[in-house]
Amino acid sequence: MQRFLFIIRDDLTKLEKMTNQERYSRCVEEQLAWIKSLADAGLHLQGEPLAIKGRLVRKDQVIADGPFIDAKEGIAGFDVILAENLDQAAEIALTCPLVRNEISIIEVRPIDGLIQLNQALNEVKK
């Protein structure tokens, strides 16, 4: 099994329009149940929601406040899951209530451990 990072990106305009507290609460409950089902299956390793605002630090030490992707989109959180391959990880992401309810999109990235990084560097050196 490999580790995969789910970068959860929210459409901030949709969140602003979600004034129905009952619908919001239902979405949160569905998300928590989804995470629990993954954890019970041994597939969910870690995850956290993120604040909308943050700081971007560059080499020249210029610090900017954000969100940084787009004015309409922000990174809402992340999850680390286990899957056999990228296809299976993407299939798991499709089951996320935030995706099904068209609140979020999930970017799925394999997490390359240091072993894989060292192997890749050795290949480049050849």
Feature-to-residue mapping (PLM):
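Conserved, structured core segments of small domains
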Residues: 1-126
